[in-house]
Amino acid sequence: MAVPKKKKSKSKRNQRHAVWKGKAAIAAQKAISLGKSILTGKAQGFVYPIEEEEEE
């Protein structure tokens, strides 16, 4: 006979949710930091194309 599963507690659910939100916050912070370093030109791990001016 089918028996319903035990219900997880709200505190456990909130704990898992907090972990997920924390990981998302860390990823967002890294993305912001990377974007700032690219915009300022201080990023060392990227190769930027050099625009050559044509002289006539």
Curated annotation (Swiss-Prot):
A GO biological-process term: translation
SUPFAM superfamilies, per database record: Zn-binding ribosomal proteins
GO MF, one example: structural constituent of ribosome
Keyword terms of this UniProt record: Ribonucleoprotein, Ribosomal protein
Source domain of life: Bacteria
Pfam families to which the protein is assigned, alphabetical: Ribosomal_L32p (PF01783)
HAMAP family (UniProt xref): Ribosomal_bL32
Record-stated family: Belongs to the bacterial ribosomal protein bL32 family.
Protein's recorded name: Large ribosomal subunit protein bL32
Source organism (scientific name): Prochlorococcus marinus (strain MIT 9215)
Taxonomic placement: Bacteria, Bacillati, Cyanobacteriota, Cyanophyceae, Synechococcales
